[in-house]
Design a protein with these regions (language model features):
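PRPP-dependent phosphoribosyltransferase catalytic core
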Residues: 27-43, 47, 234-275
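Active-site-facing substrate-recognition patch
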Residues: 37-57, 65, 81-148
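Short alpha-helical "recognition helix" segments of helix-turn-helix
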Residues: 62-70, 77
Length: 275
């Protein structure tokens, strides 16, 4: 039997991709194609993304179950997944919409994360699963479709797998803000905050990695106080680049949001009591 969860919060492709396609040369992450070529590229990319989503869900559901929810014959789904054929754009839209009703991404994440001891959140089952990361990255791509993103910025170290999956999906470079300097790099952008023990925590990004013309998506796996996120914002602002937004895999509490002056999408929100 198919488990169908509510997935109404995810924006439908018809509401995202068609407007993006019309003005694609102005909106897609850093690509400078002629408008006609860009339209075809974006449409094809979406059709291929639907196939990838089918492949990911095939690990959890049978062809019979996928056929039941999408209305596509099992034999055709099999050919999509094996790469023999690809769906038309309209068919891809219908499949995407149907699959969104099939799985609640928040429920999937909650099933894999663990709360250990006094509020410690273990995401190891998520960040070590490349299929799960790819599925979440596609969700993030849909959230930010229509916004220009040229770089993904993430603080080291735990959020790197999550940020890598997102950068690959957006097809843009990944910039890592590290806690230590590389002796081979001379110029850095720095950002600091005061830690829980009154120690100063500093992040470093090579200056050449973020330019003024960039539009940056900030990514992190867990946010508790918002201090690291605010530091990432400062780093981008120091080079006068544009912040496209921020996406957080797990947010604990909501008080920290009051001090963040950029759009933030939190995929899974946990209660303040976990701090």
């Amino acid at each position: 039997m198919i488990n169908i969860f509510s997935f109404s919060h995810l924006i439908e492709p018809k509401k995202i991709f068609k407007p993006v396609i019309k003005n694609y040369s102005k909106t897609i992450a850093g690509l400078d194609f002629m408008s006609v070529s860009a339209d075809k590229y974006e449409a094809l990319r979406f059709r291929l993304m639907v196939i990838e989503r089918l492949k990911l869900l095939k690990r959890m559901f049978s062809y019979k179950e996928l056929s039941s929810i999408t209305g596509v014959p099992e034999t055709v789904l099999c050919r999509y997944i094996k790469g023999s054929i690809i769906p038309s754009y309209d068919q891809a839209e219908r499949i995407w919409h149907a699959l969104n009703k099939m799985v609640d991404i928040r429920k999937l994440i909650l099933e894999k994360l663990e709360v250990i001891g006094e509020g410690f959140v273990d995401l190891s089952q998520i960040i070590s699963d490349p299929y799960m990361l790819q599925y979440i990255a596609q969700h993030v791509y849909m959230l930010f479709a229509g916004k220009r993103v040229t770089k993904v910025l993430a603080p080291a170290v735990n959020g790197i797998p999550f940020a890598t999956a997102i950068a690959l999906t957006f097809q843009v470079p990944l910039v890592i803000a590290r806690r230590t300097r590389n002796i081979n790099v001379i110029d850095y952008i720095e950002g600091s905050y005061i830690g829980p023990s009154a120690d100063i925590i500093t992040f470093y990004v090579p200056k050449r990695m973020i330019k003024r013309k960039d539009e940056v998506l900030i990514v992190d796996d867990i946010v508790r106080t918002g201090k690291t996120l605010r530091t990432m914002v400062k780093i981008v602002e120091r080079v006068k680049a544009i912040i496209s937004g921020a996406v957080i895999l797990v947010g604990i509490g909501e008080a920290w949001k009051k001090e963040i002056n950029i759009p933030v999408d939190v995929i899974v929100q946990l209660p303040e009591a976990l701090k």
